[in-house]
Amino acid sequence: MPTELTPTADPRRSLATQAAGIDRTKAIADAQYLDFTMLPATSTDAGDAWTTRGQNAVVHHVAARRPGTVVDTVFESETVLILTDAGAAVDVTWEGTTGALAGHGVAVLPPGAVRIDNTGTADLTLLVRSDEPGWAERASNAAAFAEPSPRVAPAEPWPAPPGPEQVRFYKADEHPLEQGRFGRIFRSRSFMVNLLAAHDGPRPADKLSPHHHDDFEQYSLATHGHYTHHIRTPWVTDRNHWKADEHVGVGSPSLTVIPPPTVHTSEADGPGENRLIDIFCPPRADFSAKPGWVRNAEDFPA
């Protein structure tokens, strides 16, 4: 739900209120600041990789700079692959059928046998449900989610897409940014990805947008530049759980997991291009209710 601090020009001011009846006595989870430039990497055929997680999703990020296999496995649930820049390119083989994808965009892969081979020179991000066998425990921050937060709603899958299962790819440049529409949003059964507008240089300090979410995490993936995440944790009845405001800078690539119901805003403050991708699991009902906001709504019904 937007707060009174949100600038009037922000399209999110028109969103409906989120969930009601949250137990305000429960402790609020810590934010996760995962700057991949500071974390140990796993070496893969395609490049260095980092696996991190929130409560509902695992984020596997690969600095794909050479030809090689990103993943070759069988998934029980759908996955989403983000090609983070124009130089990204992959061959995706799903259930024996191979297709080439190239450019900045979002691909939705149905459950089944998946092989992803890098053919480009830009970072790739694979989104996997945290209940997918064998993935959650790989995360470098897995210990932070040993006990699930009761404040985070479960990731119940949304309706299946009509027609036969297939790999679907949505290129960012085919969905240009528009005034009054918040970013470029793509939805699957389990995920929502928002390719936000880039900031050239620092974001004006008088145009930040503090807001909160009642019952879902926000995964903010910085792919270019530098950001400072400002997070305020509301007081609960137990003073032992009160926290000081946080103002944490992260480079790119990095992932910040923002727990509900913290008040938060992300401030681009790098000197050049700053680019952020917001990820949600499950998809957001409020964004989905806005006509035209979800660019692939016909493929993935609400």
Region locations from a protein language model:
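Extended, charge-rich intrinsically disordered regulatory tails
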Residues: 264, 284-286, 290-298
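Hydrophobic, ordered structural segments
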Residues: 83-162
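Conserved metal-binding segment of the jelly-roll/cupin
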Residues: 100-120, 127-130, 248-270, 277-281
